[in-house]
Amino acid sequence: MPTAANLLAIMPFPDIDPIAFSIGPLAIHWYGLAYVAGILLGWAYARRLAANESLWPGNASPMTRTQLDDFIVWAALGVVLGGRLGYIFFYDLPAVLRSPVRALEIWNGGMSFHGGLTGTTIAMIIFARRNGIPIWSLFDIVATVVPFGLFFGRIANFINGELWGRLTDVPWAVVFPTGGPFARHPSQLYEAGLEGIVLLLVLAALVYGMRALKSPGFITGVFVCGYALSRIFVEFFREPDAQLGYLLGTNWLTMGMVLSSPMILLGLWAMLRARRQAALQL
């Protein structure tokens, strides 16, 4: 158990202004730049995947670059609207019911990955049906590039000094401006590493080393499982949302764990389904 003396002795938070720069009266926040960077890098990587026909079933890309360019708008709307609505529903519903205008206060924070995933999934299904694109291949393209957004988003969380971790005295602990006087796990960086870098590399190895895109849905399953396991692991180091705390009277169960646990089963199902479909085509 870390002592108060140890907790106070850890390095302070690197004081980074959450506003990256300003153009006249317009303030550009790091969090907004993170969204832009994640979407642009993901889009560029997705275009490379779509253009490489040898990666896909029958050596034929499931969608054109023009279709992919059109989908970016759908994806962005799915992420933003789904992320905001998901946060309201999963984490902040009582407060929004008391003051509905709170739902519009995006500048005060409040985005949910699970909500963004739901919103993007709905956008993908509608877009695929309207454009005659194999839905599982579209799922795979998006799953392969999502880690870019996760990485930059968690880095922005760290810069903003939000979503910090539990009390600790590890050498790399940080004293966050809004986290009290004691040192905490930089859990945002743990998530950036696992959900961003590690998951991106694993998926890239499967795409290029094992040609996993030739089994539509397999990459999606790996991503869903990988994210869920990473999130559940980091939740043991992350401070739960103040308005919810720990659930069911425990001192460890969080909403993040509850929302992520079913994703493991969903991901396993997607992988098994993809393998069965591939076997039937042999």
UniProtKB/Swiss-Prot annotation:
GO terms for biological process: lipoprotein biosynthetic process. InterPro entries: Lgt (IPR001640). The chain crosses the membrane at residues 23-43, 71-91, 106-126, 132-152, 189-209, 217-237, 252-272. It is found in: Cell inner membrane. The keyword Ubl conjugation does not apply. Keywords: Cell inner membrane, Cell membrane, Membrane, Transferase, Transmembrane, Transmembrane helix. It comes from the Bacteria. It is a multi-pass membrane protein. Its EC number is 2.5.1.145. GO terms for cellular component: plasma membrane. PROSITE patterns: LGT (PS01311). Pathway: Protein modification; lipoprotein biosynthesis (diacylglyceryl transfer). A 1,2-diacyl-sn-glycero-3-phospho-(1'-sn-glycerol) binds at R154. It is an enzyme of class 2 (transferase). One of its GO terms (molecular function) is phosphatidylglycerol-prolipoprotein diacylglyceryl transferase activity. NCBIfam families: lgt. Belongs to the Lgt family. Catalyzes the transfer of the diacylglyceryl group from phosphatidylglycerol to the sulfhydryl group of the N-terminal cysteine of a prolipoprotein, the first step in the formation of mature lipoproteins. This is Phosphatidylglycerol--prolipoprotein diacylglyceryl transferase. It comes from Rhizobium leguminosarum bv. trifolii (strain WSM2304).
